[in-house]
């Protein structure tokens, strides 16, 4: 996967794509990547695709509870936010000193440091 945990991504598709700001304008929703599932090509983004989980009563809890948690979304529905230009961009791969280096295709900025 070309996106890593902790990076900020923009949501490109789905029910959580937009939010309305204080001026009434539609803005693209962004969030930090919390977890990556490589086999399924899905990621969990902070505050996006919230699901309601019902917990039944158990021996420890007399009452059941309802919690909200993030659901996964497909990797094709997000784009990395370029740290320098703050715009959504695709990610390309270059080889430098025998190592793979990621770069933003829109601005040509290098995303990884050469070790």
Swiss-Prot record:
Keywords: Ribonucleoprotein, Ribosomal protein, RNA-binding, rRNA-binding
Subunit note: Part of the 50S ribosomal subunit.
Alphabetical list of CDD domains matching this protein: KOW_RPL26
Family stated for the protein in its record: Belongs to the universal ribosomal protein uL24 family.
Gene behind the chain: rplX
Stretches the record annotates as Disordered: 49-68
Molecular functions (GO terms): rRNA binding; structural constituent of ribosome
Protein name stated in the entry: Large ribosomal subunit protein uL24
Organism: Phytoplasma australiense
A biological-process GO annotation: translation
InterPro entries, A to Z: Rib_uL2_dom2, Ribosomal_uL24, Ribosomal_uL24_KOW, Translation_prot_SH3-like_sf
Alphabetized HAMAP family for the sequence: Ribosomal_uL24_B
